[in-house]
Each structure stands twice: as structure tokens, then as C-alpha cells.
């Protein structure tokens, strides 16, 4: 199935943010910050994998992903969709079905030997591959999958994250010659929280302070204040 309707970008971002709140996939807690795997302290947390459990929301989000790619990348720019183990795999399958394309998945670690040791599925040499993840912060995990696809002979010029933290910019993607596509960010989630008055003003102000200066906020709240991006 090929998606051929193209909703406004701002509307898609707002709707995805509302969906994430509706299914309780996002959380704000400035008083007891979350500890991220990077060592950062954060007043925000998200679990995009919950999208998979809600068919109507899941279908709409994948329609938005297809629309974003067809409009911003083109209709004939990809030969294959790749999902990273594990969260990216179901979304890769859903997007590949939407776009009528083959799908592969990329292991975190090689299985066996050879240049295709991280690739599961059929990827001919020179295939133009789109890598999808449920979310990305600065691109570190996505580039592990991108590098594996490139090492196996694939061409990766584009990646898509359904949710982009958008707190560290896109320098990693610029340096890696990959265009990042995304649907929603923390700014969209915060805007919905404000509009619907989901939290008190102090909590919302703390979240905004984190988004404006994440490492400084982390350092003040028991987390690391420096990261290697």
C-alpha cells in the first residue's frame, strides 16, 4: 500500500505528540529525574514501542512516516527498508509494507563471519537502504546500523526516526552524510502538555529548561554534564 496523502508537517507532529500522551508513552518528572543509559539525568522519558499495541495509532503513525519520506525524499529513492535490532524491526516491517518495498533487519552484533554477518534478509550489492528507528537522540545507535549496512555493500543516504529528541542537533548525521527524517520531537510533546494543562507550570518550565540546555540540566540534577556525541 502506497500512502499518497500529505498532511501538514506541523499537524502530523501535533497529532503524534497527542497520541503519545494518549497511550501514556511519555512521562514528565522533574522532581525525580530519569537516568538515561548515557548517564544523563532527564525530566522526560518516552517509550515509542507502545505505539505497536494500538492499531489505529500505529497505522496513522506509519502513514505519516510514509508521507514524510515520499514528500521529502521522493517516490523512487529506496530499494529496501532496514530496521535495527530490536525496536526498529517491527516499524521497518510496517513501513516496508506501506511503501511496497523489501525489508531487512540489522543485528547489533555480527552472527558468524563475512560482510553480511549483521544483515538478516536479502540486500543486493548497491541497494539504496533507508534505516528506521523508533527514536533517536544524537544518532549514535542509528549509525551503528547504518555503518553495518554500508559495510555490507548498501548505500545509506537517509534515515528516519518516528521521534527525534532534537536536543543535540543533527551534526552526527551531517558528518555521516545522512539526511534524518522525523515526525515529532520533545518540543511538540511539550506544546501539547501546555495546551492541555497536563502539568503544573513548574514542571513544564523544568522540562523546557532541559530541552534548552540538556547537559547543564543533567549536571544540576545528578547526571553527567558532558557527552561524546
Swiss-Prot record:
Q: Which reaction does it catalyse?
A: orotidine 5'-phosphate + diphosphate = orotate + 5-phospho-alpha-D-ribose 1-diphosphate
User: Which Enzyme Commission number(s) are listed?
Assistant: 2.4.2.10
Annotated positions binding 5-phospho-alpha-D-ribose 1-diphosphate: 107-108, 111, 113, 133-141
UniProt-listed InterPro entries: OPRT, Or_phspho_trans_dom, PRibTrfase_dom, PRTase-like
Keywords, alphabetical: Glycosyltransferase, Magnesium, Pyrimidine biosynthesis, Transferase
Q: Pathway, according to UniProt? A: Pyrimidine metabolism; UMP biosynthesis via de novo pathway; UMP from orotate: step 1/2
The entry describes its oligomerization and partners as: Homodimer.
Alphabetized Pfam families for the sequence: Pribosyltran (PF00156)
Tell me the protein family, please.
Belongs to the purine/pyrimidine phosphoribosyltransferase family. PyrE subfamily.
The answer, when asked if Metal-binding is one of the entry's keywords, is no
Please report the organism this UniProt entry assigns to the protein.
Rhizobium etli (strain ATCC 51251 / DSM 11541 / JCM 21823 / NBRC 15573 / CFN 42)
Protein name, per record: Orotate phosphoribosyltransferase
The molecular function terms of the Gene Ontology recorded here are: magnesium ion binding; orotate phosphoribosyltransferase activity
- What is known about what this protein does? Catalyzes the transfer of a ribosyl phosphate group from 5-phosphoribose 1-diphosphate to orotate, leading to the formation of orotidine monophosphate (OMP).
Q: Which residues bind orotate?
A: 137
Highest taxon of the source?
Bacteria
